[in-house]
Amino acid sequence: MPIQLTNDIIIKKLVSRIITNKNKGGYTPMLATILIDNIACGELKGEWGLSIYIEYNGKNILLDTGASDLFAKNAQKLEKSIESVDYAVLSHAHYDHSDSMATFFNLNDHAPFFLREGCQENCYAKKWIFHKYIGLPKHILTDYRDRIIYTDGDYEIIPGVYLIPHKTPNLKMVGKRESMYRKEHHRWIYDDFSHEQSLVFRTQKGLVIFNSCCHGGVANIINEVGATFPTEKVYGIIGGFHLFNKSEEEIKNVIQQIKDTGIHYVC
């Protein structure tokens, strides 16, 4: 896979990876640039969160906005135009991926923002006896209702770009294990991550999955996409795997599960 390094800042901060995508004109690149993650380097700032700028077949797609306006500031330094984004996608309803949605809407006056239908202001993490709110910025769903599109089931944004929900049963047990909850009808229930979705691109090498946290399990997500497109190869998965709080044994098990899927590229 070729690697494009555009300047010293990008070289230090990230590697922009190109996966060729076939169209009538031959092969055009898909370029994914990390705008924000938890690593700061040089002029680029970092924070607990993620935002990825994806260029595909002449369209610009933003995945998540991170936890502050740093995604937009880094985008300017990386010469990526937030104003030129055609479509925005929210991976899941947690603050570190959504808190700067308002910043995006203020900078971009036209792109729809795709959220899974399960996204509400109701995500919490439990520590001891306390439930801490970790969800969407308050009132974002009403303040920008005209810019938000809710997705249900398998959803095609444009040809070759898809949003895929979880299809693995009983994911509420993941919520139980991770002490993540949703509040519904004045009661606490384990989060089943019905608000999480995968952003999938069809490329010449195969399907490429972007999932910012993989709360539902990275191997589950690979298998979900594979089952959705049974005649196509799942080539790669890019994003966050939420392994920072896992034991060495748990991480080894996840690595083996990923290997068992037969996927070629992991980032």
Where are these regions (language model features)?
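N-terminal amphipathic/basic-hydrophobic helices that include classical n-h-c signal peptides
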Residues: M1-T28
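Glycine-rich phosphate-binding "P-loop"
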Residues: T28-G42, S179-Y190, G239-N245
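Conserved beta-strand hairpin/beta-sheet module of binuclear metal-dependent hydrolase folds
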Residues: M30-K77, D192, E196-N211
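Active-site metal-binding motif and surrounding structural segment of the metallo-beta-lactamase
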Residues: L70-Q120, A227-G236
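Cap/insert and terminal regions of metallo-dependent hydrolase folds
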Residues: Y95-H97, Y190-C267
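Metal-dependent catalytic neighborhoods of phosphoester/phosphodiester hydrolases
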Residues: D99-N108, K132-Y133, S247-N253
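Hydrophobic alpha-helical segments and helix pairs
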Residues: A111-D152
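Active-site-proximal loop/helix segment associated with metal-binding centers of metalloenzymes
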Residues: I129-H131, L141, G153-K205
